[in-house]
Amino acid sequence: MSQRKPWEIIIRPIITEKSNRLMEDYNKYTFEVALDASKPEIKYAVEKLFNVKVKKVNTMIVKPKKKRVWNKFRQYGTTKKWKKAIVTLEKGHKIDILEFAQK
């Protein structure tokens, strides 16, 4: 495991309709994480930051999307690729995600 701090691994929580439904129904929380973070690093970071017990971590890399840049040449650019982690917690553990998002 690397010597990075937990807040260097977890970038921000992702709060969407789908992630809220996962939170309420399945106790799964969604985070944007560092692109080179591994599953054990993500598990360690979530457990240290929120004092909870992690059951499982699923990760995926979100592909870059093509975007138009409106200048006089109408060029195309892309967004950056990023990594998303869906963290499943043990029963009885909860995270106050809105409190973390405000920090």
Swiss-Prot record:
InterPro entries named in the record: Nucleotide-bd_a/b_plait_sf (IPR012677), Ribosomal_uL23-like (IPR013025), Ribosomal_uL23/eL15/eS24_sf (IPR012678), Ribosomal_uL23_CS (IPR001014)
Keywords: Ribonucleoprotein, Ribosomal protein, RNA-binding, rRNA-binding
Any one GO CC term of the record: cytosolic large ribosomal subunit
GO terms, biological process: translation
UniProt-recorded Gene Ontology molecular function terms: rRNA binding; structural constituent of ribosome
Gene3D superfamilies documented for this protein: 3.30.70.330
Domain of life: Bacteria
UniProt KW Zinc keyword: no
Annotated signal peptide: none
Entry keyword annotation includes Lipid biosynthesis: no
Family indicated by similarity: Belongs to the universal ribosomal protein uL23 family.
HAMAP family xref list: Ribosomal_uL23_B (MF_01369_B)
Function: One of the early assembly proteins it binds 23S rRNA. One of the proteins that surrounds the polypeptide exit tunnel on the outside of the ribosome. Forms the main docking site for trigger factor binding to the ribosome.
Subunit structure: Part of the 50S ribosomal subunit. Contacts protein L29, and trigger factor when it is bound to the ribosome.
NCBIfam families named in the record: PRK05738.1-3, PRK05738.2-4
Protein known as: Large ribosomal subunit protein uL23
